[in-house]
Each structure stands twice: as structure tokens, then as C-alpha cells.
Amino acid sequence: MKAVFDTNILVDYLGGSEAARGELARYRVRLISIITVIELMVGAKDSREEAAIRGLLSSFEILELSAEIAQEAVVIRKELRLKIPDAIVYATARTQGCLLVSRNTRELKSDWPDIRISYHL
């Protein structure tokens, strides 16, 4: 099974969350949006954190922003009123035909198609 992971899952993993670790282990094919890469790297406080992030990123297939993803993000933004980064990450999952795994219950709803709210902190 494959899934696109939202940034919050990776942040939790880097913080030592067992729930995040278990969630990542559920999926054989793990994908992330280039948006997640940007969000993680911007949040790194020092070179040690950057190295930890790069190590984690090496275990994911990173999906670039394509015209197809951009168009789907426009549809999502208009229909669901998500912020642009969230719309791009969700569009990435939809265009790949897989789940978006997140714990973002503020913007995402578990009853939306292709969304898995995996745990709560």
C-alpha cells in the first residue's frame, strides 16, 4: 500500500513520536510532496536538525509539483478552501491515487475522500 504523508507526520516522527513511527511503518511505498520538503527544511534550527531531516527524506519518494498536481490543487482550493500548501499536498495524494496521511484535523476532515487522520496528539 502507498500513501502521501503530510508534514505533521514527519515532524512528529523527528520528535520521537511512536504514533508517527507506527504510521510510517504501515506503508510499503511512502511518498511526500516537495512542499513537505520545503516546510521541513525551513523549520530546521541548525545543521544537526538539517542532517536528521535529510536522513528521513531519503526514505521517501519526493514528488515534484507538476501541472497535473497544480490543476488539482486549484480545484481543491476552490472547493474546500484549503491553504495553498495544504491543497498542493492533498492534490499530490489525489493525483497518485493514494491516501493522504495526516493528523491535521483543523483543515482536513477524516470523511473526505482519500484522507486518513492517523492519530491525535
Report the location of each language-model feature:
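Short active-site oxyanion
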Residues: 1, 27-29, 59-61, 94-99
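Short, well-structured N-terminal submotif of metal-dependent ribonuclease cores
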Residues: 1-32, 41-55
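Histidine- and aromatic-rich ligand-binding microenvironments
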Residues: 5-6, 32-33, 82-83, 104-105, ...
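Alpha-helix capping/helix-boundary segments
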Residues: 9-10, 36, 69, 88-89, ...
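Acidic, PIN/NYN-like endoribonuclease modules and their adjacent C-terminal/linker elements
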Residues: 17, 90, 94-121
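Acidic catalytic patch
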Residues: 58-79
